[in-house]
Amino acid sequence: MVTNSPRLRVLIVDDEPLIRWSLAETLEQSGHAVVEAGDGQSAIRSVSDGEPFDVVLLDYRLPDSNDLNLLATIRKLAPGSAVIMMTAFGTPEVMMGALKLGAYQVIPKPFEIHEVAALVLRAHVAPR
């Protein structure tokens, strides 16, 4: 289903293939261009190479990254990208730390895929 919303470039960073696939399918059906990364190093390469992303969906806990450090690196490499952090470890410390580092929002897992798709649009138009 293609809508009248802008076509965004979205990076999905999660080590769970099913989550990446579900988000990618929904966002692509809305007309967005999606790139997937299954680990922190792939995410850094994707952000460093090529055209910038409008929105980054970032899992908090990845096997090869140090939690909030990856968020800080992405914010430094791509200050124009809105970052939405996804986490099953939504303690107040994690949420506040992510927001202080520039995350647009922190969302708990599990989540509704269509709600995340709507959040991607809101994050894109929000001031950074």
Q: Where are the model-predicted features located?
A:
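Alpha4 helix (beta4-alpha4-beta5 surface) of REC/receiver domains from two-component response regulators
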Residues: 69, 90-105
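C-terminal output helix
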Residues: 92-93, 111-121
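Short amphipathic alpha-helix used as the core "switch/output" element in two-component signaling
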Residues: 68-80, 97
